[in-house]
A protein has these predicted regions:
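Short, structured beta-strand/loop micro-motifs enriched in basic residues and often containing a Trp
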Residues: 1-8
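Structured core elements
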Residues: 3, 23, 54, 162-164
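Short, surface-exposed secondary-structure edge patches
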Residues: 10-15
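Feature captures the catalytic cores and cofactor-binding loops of soluble hydro-lyases/lyases
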Residues: 30-159
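Active-site/ligand-binding-proximal alpha/beta "capping" segment
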Residues: 85-87, 163-188
């Protein structure tokens, strides 16, 4: 299993293929609906995503003894970000998009053009993902958007994912759908 460490280098990302399991370690930032809309509307994102990771996640986070503790951090459905993701990939230089359920052809094309991949995280395992968060380093837009929509900065350790859309234009979701249709046709 390949280990991806922040900063995520383009040459490493371009070496990944759809279907390959990976673990992600280092800085991973969250962003979901409010984040993407804010970006699309020209809002200033206060962090640099170049060679970084964006996790579609609305975590449950509590403050204990003056520090943030991540209780749950499951992926949220990525398809909602389809209208925004190609531009975000192009403009930010992000290398990893992490979520669940896949994204559209425009995002796949942006991944291929700009050296990015879409990683499928395990849905329904928010406690498992939270256990991979060593530290919540910081948070942006907490007061404005609330904890679930805020942009969190997590220090992750061995976060398991699968390359679902690679930088060569291959989508695991499309491959599985095609194989399923072929199998169905053979049954008829």
């Amino acid at each position: 299993m390949k280990r991806l460490e922040y900063p995520f280098r383009e040459e490493d990302v371009r070496g990944l293929v759809a279907g390959e399991p990976v673990v992600v370690s280092g800085l991973v930032r969250t962003g979901r609906d409010r984040f993407h809309k804010y970006f699309a509307d020209g809002g200033r994102i206060p962090v640099d995503f170049r060679d970084g990771a964006l996790f579609h996640c609305g975590p449950v986070v509590v403050k204990r003894d003056g520090a943030w503790k991540v209780v749950a951090a499951g992926p949220t459905t990525s398809v909602r970000e389809n209208p925004y993701e190609p531009d975000f990939i192009r403009e930010s230089g992000v290398r990893l998009i992490i979520g669940k359920g896949g994204m559209d052809g425009a995002t796949l094309a942006a991944c291929a053009k700009h050296g990015c991949v879409y990683l499928q995280a395990v849905g329904g395992a928010a406690a498992l993902t939270a256990a991979c968060v060593k530290e919540a380093r910081g948070v942006h837009f907490l007061e404005e958007w609330g904890a679930a929509e805020a942009c969190w900065e997590f220090d992750m350790d061995s976060f398991p994912c699968v390359v679902a859309m690679d930088s060569h234009g291959t989508s695991l979701f499309e491959s599985v759908a095609e194989a399923s249709l072929d199998a169905l046709a053979r049954l008829r």
